[in-house]
């Protein structure tokens, strides 16, 4: 039985406003639709500023190397080299100070957003907004192997949170607006509105509720329109004249996806255990970690500049350049290791784009082997590179639909939908069989354990719990739900109709259960609504 002992003005206000929203469900969804447009505008403008600063900082880094540092190295002039090293140290100190000022702005930002949506973490939206834009552009621009997608998703999310706080919305509505902001963030980062919308549904909320779909769809489309006004309609990757892969090569696709599924497990393992490298006896402060990573970037700028930054230009080069196998393996190893070093230092930036680049390099290595063995024509090398990207993403993130749509939109070629979906499925199944954890779930749990100060205080929030077919909650009466204190079932939505909760009411697949509870209790019910009853 659920406790009916509820008191307090905060709880009463949540109940009243939520009842109002649920009783006027169609008006509530229309309001979310309109608010999604404003979230998309705010997120699109913020991310456009972030992308502009990032592009300028990367151009400045390239200019410094080719105009100053490389010529100085050739003439044995140490002054410019020492000056650049001091600049990197100063940048490291500044990034550390900003991360100390806004701890939730460090790292990718996606686990943090997910934690806030689940009601497990809290964000100070205005502080994170400017720190993420500035620190992300500086760190990635200085050469760290980090991506713009994580910061963009968090920037969009805090834009949605800011709108919610400005308008005084309930926590339930705020979660929808944060989700729509995250959707806008991914869409604006890569000109990929479909992937942005699907990421919010598949990864963040893990259900296809209409209340989630409407604001995420409008915000993703609006944010994409805004960013295209500044950066044009071009795709992130530029593959020219892709030839569709014949059906007889599908077993190659399965083999490549299987290998990339294994690579995804290895990538996740490295990302979760890079902390052992940054041992506290050697790296006593976060500043020392960031400075070390930046100095590594400074050295790699002379040796392997291809692995610096996100790496989308490297993917374009792989499609048109026949690199030797040894050099491809060197690039793969260097990109993987430097991505771990960059992410592990805690500087603001994601691993989404570096993950795709590592997948592209893995695909390039496999394509080289297949072509040299006479098993595949060289004309299909770009196809294998794309398959490597989508497979590694599906294995690591465990969001195969998002990965498929993202690569399709980033390449601008939808003729490969079937092949990419097939590869995503194989890689996903491989990772599931090997019992690898989805990377963002693992990072969220680690963040909650390592930084309890960022966790939410136990407050009552309205949570939407979808009931999946075959789940632990399907066909259960309300009276048989697990006992939880301070929890109230407010309403059940079934086929668009509202049902008043009754102890004898049985839950059906497709129902949406609206409960007012502490976040951790609600998360337990959400897992039961998703997990299969088959053991």
Predicted features, each with a name:
Residues 459-467:
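Short glycine-/aliphatic-rich beta-strand segments at the starts of folded cytosolic domains
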Residues 107, 134, 459, 483-486:
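A short, polar/charged loop/turn motif at coil->beta-strand junctions and beta-hairpin connectors
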Residues 450-460:
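Interdomain regulatory linker/hinge segments that flank or connect interaction modules
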Residues 385-386, 396-397, 457-459, 482-484, ...:
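A structural signal for short secondary-structure junctions
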Residues 1-452, 469, 494-496, 510-513, ...:
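Alpha-helical transmembrane segments and immediately membrane-proximal extracytoplasmic
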Residues 530-535:
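A common structural junction motif
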Residues 468-525, 529:
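Cytosolic Rossmann-like ligand/nucleotide-binding regulatory domains
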